[in-house]
Amino acid sequence: MNINTYNLNEKLSTEVTKIAKDSISIFSNLFGEYPYDTYSVIASDFYIGGMEYPTLVMIDQSLYNEKDKFLLEYVIAHETAHQWWYSVIGNDEISEPWLDEALTEYSTVLYFEEKYGKEVGSKLIKTMEMQTRNHSSEDIFKATTQYKNSIDYSLNVYTKGALAFNEVRKKVGDEVFFET
């Protein structure tokens, strides 16, 4: 498989390539083989973090920051997870955005758990729980256009959705969760 990275920060190029390889490997082990021959991570003028397409993700070049590599890794892992959740397993992203975004966000937690240990995954879950504490009555099962604003959308679709998958995992256990 060919992994390409394009960015203007030469110091981070090797790390970005490693993150891309690690995320493809981890997600292939968890969800099934990556179905394409190539994968590209491209830095771009993109104000919302990242965007996914089959075999290609665009990452906001402002995230290529040596002082905060965690956020860069998080966004690359998240956008890479979209290669499964939306690209391989499609859904209606407008009517049911929680399906791919919640799975993708939870997959990002799984990436960090697999790469750095369960404690890191648990910290990410705790952060998500704190972020959503005051939004617990909001429904995640709405169309994209039904959210009040981008913060409401993000907290519900990404964060609460990921927490819902975490609750399922806790209820059924790892063996059943990852087998299904």
Regions found by a protein language model. Give the residues of each.
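Positions in alpha-helical segments
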Residues: F70, L163-N166, E179
